A protein has these predicted regions:
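Solvent-exposed beta-hairpin/edge-strand motifs
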Residues: 96-111
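C-terminal beta-strand-rich structural cap/linker in extracellular carbohydrate-active enzymes
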Residues: 117-137
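Surface-exposed, flexible loop/turn segments at secondary-structure boundaries
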Residues: 20, 88, 113
Length: 137
């Protein structure tokens, strides 16, 4: 889903489940996804922040698609999503975001490694196909 949003999707089209058995594990997962996207609604239509990008450095393999970055601002909140589109781990440098904004970003869904300031930007390591979500409070 994040890859679709990265490439321009702004919603999910669903045309029904009248013939599906209930209860079904698929619907539990589907409703979880819909609830998560409901909270993202303001960011889906906000448009990409200009001049924000990610540079990908390989660990063991050259990047194929590399890491995409979704950076959007809605009101006084900022959402940054790093999406590793490759099966391989990559070092990623986030560039173009003001340091004051980056210092306010909080990782969604777990601790672990954050964004570390370097001369070039803010670096972090992403595993293959990993999605890392940050949002300001």
């Amino acid at each position: 889903a994040w890859d679709a949003i990265l490439h321009g999707a702004t919603g999910i089209m669903w045309w029904g489940s009248a013939y599906a058995d209930r209860p079904h594990p698929f619907f539990d997962g589907w409703m979880t996804v819909l609830r998560e996207f409901e909270g993202l609604h303001p960011f889906l239509f906000a448009g990409q922040m200009p001049h924000v990008w990610a540079e990908t450095y390989y660990r063991q393999h050259d990047p194929i698609l590399g890491v995409g970055v979704l950076a959007r601002r809605a009101g006084n909140r900022t959402l940054v999503v790093l999406i590793n589109q490759d099966q391989y781990a990559h070092e990623t440098v986030l560039k173009g975001l003001d340091e004051a904004v980056v210092m306010r970003l909080r990782r969604v869904g777990g601790g672990g490694e954050g964004l570390v300031k370097t001369r070039e930007g803010f670096i972090t390591a992403l595993e293959g196909y990993e999605v890392r979500i940050y949002i300001t409070d």
